[in-house]
From Swiss-Prot:
This is mRNA-decapping protein OPG121. It is an enzyme of class 3 (hydrolase). Belongs to the Nudix hydrolase family. Keywords: Hydrolase, Magnesium, Manganese, Metal-binding. Transmembrane segments: none annotated. It comes from Vaccinia virus (strain Western Reserve) (VACV). The lineage of its organism: Viruses, Varidnaviria, Bamfordvirae, Nucleocytoviricota, Pokkesviricetes.
Length: 213
């Protein structure tokens, strides 16, 4: 089943409210963020696992000079185990319970558009950087989705644009190599993330981009 132009589909997770809408063109501005729904040469959808969780990054950005972390307990389930250990090390009162050792901050690969780049050139550059130059693009799809995400924990709204990207590498080519990119710690198959809160809407995005005409 496809999605018609300007039709809006809504997904909600414990943390996010996501609006997905098919559009004709990606606007070009200094704040435009573009993402690739990557498909391997053997047909697997790819997703990135971020090196640092968004929750922990937000805490670090608000850290004061006396090195005290003030942390809402609502954020704890959205952090990596090593980040929780760092918080626990500085804890003066309270406790940390119900830690999920399997948490991963899943993201679509991509980034911010440079004003001198085309959309596709931006995605080629970002994929090259985030994969330590392991990913090369075979072709892009023609369908464009606008993704509007409201982060309910921080009450912020993020807008991005996504298109399918068919790459030359197989899943095997990418799954057994270490990545040293500052932002991405791992590239993996979305099919391995069925228990993640984001899996449902990420799967929908891939299906729409690959199967829509």
């Amino acid at each position: 089943m496809g999605i018609t132009m300007d039709e809006e589909v809504i997904f909600e997770t414990p943390r996010e409210l996501i609006s997905i809408k098919r559009i004709k063109d990606i606007p070009r501005s200094k704040d435009t963020h573009v993402f690739a729904a990557c498909i391997t040469s053997d047909g697997y959808p790819l997703i990135g696992a971020r090196r640092t969780s968004f929750a922990f990054q937000a805490i670090l950005s608000q850290q004061n000079s006396d090195s005290i972390f003030r942390v809402s307990t609502k954020l704890l389930r959205f952090m990596y185990y090593n980040e929780l250990r760092e918080i626990f090390r500085r804890l003066r009162k309270g406790s940390i319970n119900n830690i999920d050792p399997h948490f991963e901050e899943l993201i679509l690969l991509g980034g911010k558009l440079d004003k001198k780049e085309s959309i596709k050139d931006c995605l080629r550059r970002e994929l090259k950087e985030e994969s330590d130059e392991r990913i090369t693009v075979k072709e892009f799809g023609n369908v464009i989705l606008k993704l509007t995400t409201r982060d309910k924990l921080f009450n912020k709204v993020y807008i991005g644009y996504c298109m399918a990207c068919f790459i030359n590498q197989s899943l095997e080519d990418l799954s057994h190599t270490s990545i040293y990119n500052v932002e991405i710690r791992k590239i993996k198959s979305l099919n391995d993330c069925i228990n993640d809160d984001k899996y449902e809407y990420l799967s929908y995005i891939y299906n729409m981009l690959v199967n829509s005409k």
